[in-house]
Amino acid sequence: MNIYDLIVLGAGTSGIYCASYGAMKGLSSLVIEMTDRIGGQPAHVYPFKKIYDFPTANGILAKDFVDQLYQQQKPYITQGLITYLHNTTIQEQNYLDDQQLFELKLSDNQHVKAKKIILATGNGGFEPIKLKDELIQDQNLDCIHYKINDLTQYQNKDLCFLGGGDSAVELINQLADLKIAKSLSIIHRNHKYRAAQALVDLINKKPINQYLDQTIELIKDNKISFKDNQSGESTQLNFDYLIVQYGLKPLKSLECFDHLEQDLNNNFVINHHHQTSDPNIYAIGLASNFSKRPNLILSGMYEATVAIKHINDTINPYLRATDYLLKE
């Protein structure tokens, strides 16, 4: 049975860097990810969204940012300090007092052991909120996209976005800037967008057909019919691709950690070391969301360093490692 210093649950940006920083300290990590790829929401939901609020990331695409995080840790993967398991969840966890180790049963029936566990699961697993089945009739579902993986497929196509949050508005702005689509339209159920005002200001300056305060009636044969909530007037648009950005809904995947103390929002309660009510289990990122916490990629990475430093000091109490560069 494999024994690791750390089990990192969740391979979003916080979890990826958590494993990297642990490897810098010589700690071995098994990173368990319930989906088929790493990166969390930046990879799964908005890979073509640009990141500005991270040091040195001056408009880097989210997918490229995730790739850079992975490239940083590739030497540690080669050394065997970082291992990934995809499409995997933890089914059972028990703490063996005599060995001071966790024993975990995974969804593939594999058993592993670890000294510490770090929960980096964000809001838990998630999946896109999809269109209601009754709205879709005689429609090729391949033309309905809930995430964007390849922009080239939209070359000279009629695109229609559904949604009015940051993801929908920012993505359609980017496509307008790239000038690859034949036409761009956006349909939103409310009378105003739920996106940042700076993004809304941009969309109003671009050749984008906007339909606000609308109710979707039918999607059939690459046509979408919708009704104005004020006038009752119906409209029909042709599309090549329908891009749905209604947000995400959580998937419950942490049942075996329900014994840990949680707040009213189901976030794990932590101390200043990011330990949960079980001192051998840590939580970082949105899994430990607390009042006034900045919802930034940078925040999760800082929290990873706090947790890793405490774990390393606990596992290797006589190893006096520095967390800064010494001047020569």
From Swiss-Prot:
Question: PANTHER family attached here?
Answer: THIOREDOXIN REDUCTASE 1-RELATED-RELATED
Give the cofactor note text: Binds 1 FAD per subunit.
The catalysed reaction is: 2 reduced [2Fe-2S]-[ferredoxin] + NADP(+) + H(+) = 2 oxidized [2Fe-2S]-[ferredoxin] + NADPH
Q: Which residues cross the membrane?
A: none
Q: Which family does it belong to?
A: Belongs to the ferredoxin--NADP reductase type 2 family.
- The record's disulfide annotation reads none
What are its E.C. numbers?
1.18.1.2
List the HAMAP family. Answer: FENR2
Share what the entry says about its subunit structure, partners included. Answer: Homodimer.
Single annotated GO MF: NADP binding
- What is the uppermost EC class here? oxidoreductase
Protein's organism? Mycoplasmoides gallisepticum (strain R(low / passage 15 / clone 2)) (Mycoplasma gallisepticum)
Q: Which domain of life is it from?
A: Bacteria
Q: Which UniProt keywords apply?
A: FAD, Flavoprotein, NADP, Oxidoreductase
List, separated by semicolons, the cofactors it needs: FAD
Q: Where does FAD bind?
A: 14, 33, 41, 46, 90, 126
| Protein name (record) | Ferredoxin--NADP reductase
Name the Pfam families on file. Answer: Pyr_redox_2
